[in-house]
Amino acid sequence: MQTGFSNSRMNSFISSVLVLHFNKQEIKFEPSVWCEAIDIHNTFSAGEIITGDIICFQKILKPPDIPKYPSVASFLQHVCDRKTYEEVRKVHILEEEIVTLKHQADTYLVQKEKAVTAYDQLKHERDNAVQQVNELRDQSTHIILDFSRKDMEQATEHFKNAREVGDTEYGHTYKGMIHNMKVLIKLSSSQKLFQQEVSILRQWRHPNIITFIGVCSEVSALVYEWLPNGNLEDRIICTNNSAPLSWYNRTQIIGEICCALLFLHSNKSTALVHGDLRPCNILIDANYRSKICNFGMSNLFLQLGTFPPNLTARLPYMDPEFNTTGELTTLSDVYSLGVIILRLLTGMPPLTLSEKVAEALGSDSLHLLIDKSAGDWPYIEAKQLALIGLSCTGMTRKKRPDLLNEVWIVIEPLTRKPPAATWPYLQSASGDSSVPAAFICPISMEIMKDPQVASDGFTYEAEAIRCWFDRGISRSPMTNLALPNLNLVPNRVLRSFIHGYLQQQQPNPAYQQQLSET
């Protein structure tokens, strides 16, 4: 190895390298010799060279294909160009990699978009399939039977007067028997009324709406389930010396009516207004569960400037604003509900009832108006009902509360199970031993074996509510409102009461079987 500098001149060379300046006269340049730095990989940069470092070069014969360098400057330029070329080549390689990666990313993005589109399409097809299955299930579960004229005549003994249980503007109603099953048969007062009621009842199913069984087009008759405890009006005034309703049953009935109205009003775009909510249009089943009827047909009777049939009975429950607007809205039903609440609380006739309750609240004498035949009303709950009832009966719609956000949030907690000490009041005030309504699943309408509380606050039989969820339905069976979640919480307290109740019914073999199943 030979050096291009003598030791005595090394420091001056280093200094000249650091300032990128060379004294050409100090180097004996031989054109036929190729000087190559031993540190060919540029391990050290110029800034890292300090005084005292030795820079070594190796003299080797130039290959024939390597051009001669006429000067040191041209040699250094070649080294610089070579380094620049390598950097440019690396940049080019990186740019090619970037282009490749971008192409791959674009490909993946297209594939993702196709996958999302395919997913959306499959989800749409799945939702349609679920909807069709639910519709088919509903059709199979709620089959509307067609009866002949002969069936109707046999069921009512040719519409015998003794079979008649009601006569209203909606038609004559009869107690009948079809295939050993008790039914309620209504002969519509007009063909138009018959067609409208059939159309409505085919669409609306709810635990607190009377169950529609079938029709007889020949005589414009509708067939419903039989509800043995008559209508709410008869129960309030104790017709035929019937037992008065307990305060607990009255509270439950208020909650059930409110729940049914929420269901009818739930679809804002196609909300169905009852329009004739009165105690006579609320029926009571064997378990003191209430069911509304004759809804959505008031437009056939109520026309502005005309006198509707049975005006005296309708007037106390009729929205005052209807007299000026001729229009019924969901707030019209809220007004009617308020009057019914006050009637159940006091047992008094509806006319001017709101004024009497308001006066009693103002003089702190509400306890004097409360119906004593209902048992010992919890005073705080009674006062809450009085206040919400008065609020509902505001003379103008602007003054009435919203059914969901202001009425239901007050009533719903009152419908919960009372303290254990007051549990006997689940029965009627006369000691009627019918099954308490709280024990009945609102879906299956049977005594619950495994009661579960859903996120809507209602208690259902576990199997029934899970089947409801399995159908892809995420709305409340009671209010038709969206459920916050599909979680279920065991109602162990209620299950304990049901178990105790069934034990008391042990002499009855049917209840013994029910008990063994729980």
UniProtKB/Swiss-Prot annotation:
What EC number(s) are associated with this protein in UniProt? 2.3.2.27
Class of this enzyme = transferase
Which residues does the UniProt record annotate as the domain Protein kinase?
Answer: 159-409
Keywords carried by this UniProt record: Coiled coil, Transferase, Ubl conjugation pathway
Q: Which residues form a coiled coil?
A: 86-142
Which pathway does the database say it acts in?
Protein modification; protein ubiquitination
In the UniProt record, does the keyword Cytoplasm occur?
no
Gene3D superfamilies referenced in this protein's UniProt entry, alphabetically: Phosphatidylinositol 3-kinase Catalytic Subunit, Chain A, domain 1, Phosphorylase Kinase, domain 1, Transferase(Phosphotransferase) domain 1, Zinc/RING finger domain, C3HC4 (zinc finger)
**Its biological purpose:** Possesses E3 ubiquitin-protein ligase in vitro. May be involved in cell death signaling.
Domain comment, as recorded: The protein kinase domain is predicted to be catalytically inactive.
Query: Protein name, please?
Result: U-box domain-containing protein 57
Q: Which organism is it from?
A: Oryza sativa subsp. japonica (Rice)
- The gene behind this protein is PUB57
